[in-house]
């Protein structure tokens, strides 16, 4: 048989103190109050019956359900900040993508290059120029022992700059240990001409065009150095492949 007995004042104080401590980090005052409640309860002769325990649990549950909005709000504010909205993250990603591809835009062909193409093509004013790349030269690009300008295929602005015969020569080179490449002429803005050779290489899965042969002379005569920014164009005249080099000096 179960006897009901009223919950003692000490028990109620203990429960209320525990409830406050469960919702947030206990303060020193709350901790001391709990210790005092326990001491008082131990000194009390009140006997707790099963029904008393059930009533105490019910009392705790009711208090939890009636938790004040202020306390709930405080707990929410303790949470770490939420991640940015999906639209904001997409916007940032798009901005990075735009920044990364900004060097792949097509600027107008320089006037001196149009005049050169006209003279090479017998007065024909058709602009068949292709923008190849904007690039900051690395140390290896100006190293005389390397003797080549590296052009990553993934960074080329207009990929269709080779004619049919040149493409076939590049494809046949793929199975050769000693590359033959495609002969070309590089012209600078002073209209100086340098014989060069274009070759395609696969560097561990990364496709690179290399300008070789006369590249060291280009570096010397055009005063190219590491960190120099250049823009490279191409065009055809009488079925000959030309490259046009434009150093991009800071203002």
UniProtKB/Swiss-Prot annotation:
Q: Which domain of life is it from?
A: Eukaryota
Query: Does the record's keyword annotation contain DNA damage?
Result: no
| Any one cellular-component term (Gene Ontology) | nucleus
Which molecular-function annotation in GO is an example for this chain?
DNA binding
Q: What Gene3D superfamilies does this protein's entry cite?
A: DNA-binding pseudobarrel domain
| DNA-binding region, residue intervals | 153-249
**Chain spans, region Disordered:** 48-111
Where can this protein be found?
Nucleus
Print the keywords alphabetically: DNA-binding, Nucleus, Transcription, Transcription regulation
> NADP among the record's keywords?
no
Composition bias of kind Basic and acidic residues appears in 56-70
Query: What is the protein's major site of localization?
Result: nucleus
| One Pfam family in the UniProt entry | At2g31720-like
Output this protein's name: B3 domain-containing protein At2g24670
| Organism whose genome encodes this protein | Arabidopsis thaliana (Mouse-ear cress)
């Amino acid at each position: 048989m179960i006897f009901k007995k009223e919950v003692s004042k000490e028990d109620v104080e203990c429960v209320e103190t525990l409830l406050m401590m469960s919702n947030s980090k206990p303060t020193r005052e709350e901790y001391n109050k709990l210790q005092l409640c326990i001491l008082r309860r131990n000194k009390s002769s009140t006997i707790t019956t099963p029904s008393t325990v059930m009533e105490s649990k019910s009392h705790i549950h009711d208090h939890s359900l009636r938790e004040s909005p202020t306390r709930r709000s405080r707990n929410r504010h303790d949470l770490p900040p939420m991640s940015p909205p999906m639209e904001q993250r997409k916007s940032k990603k798009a901005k990075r993508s735009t920044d990364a591809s900004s060097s792949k835009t097509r600027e107008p062909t320089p006037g001196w290059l149009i005049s050169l193409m006209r003279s090479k093509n017998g007065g024909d004013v058709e602009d068949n120029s292709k923008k190849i790349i904007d690039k900051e030269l690395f140390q290896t690009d100006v190293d005389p022992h390397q003797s080549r300008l590296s052009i990553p295929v993934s960074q080329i602005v207009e990929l269709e700059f080779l004619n049919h015969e040149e493409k076939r020569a590049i494809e046949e080179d793929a199975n050769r240990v000693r590359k033959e490449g495609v002969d070309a002429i590089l012209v600078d803005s002073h209209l100086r001409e340098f014989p060069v050779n274009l070759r395609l290489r696969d560097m561990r899965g990364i496709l690179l065009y290399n300008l070789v042969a006369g590249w060291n002379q280009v570096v010397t005569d055009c005063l190219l150095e590491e960190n120099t920014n250049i823009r490279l164009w191409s065009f055809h005249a009488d079925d000959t492949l030309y490259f046009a080099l434009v150093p991009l000096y800071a203002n």
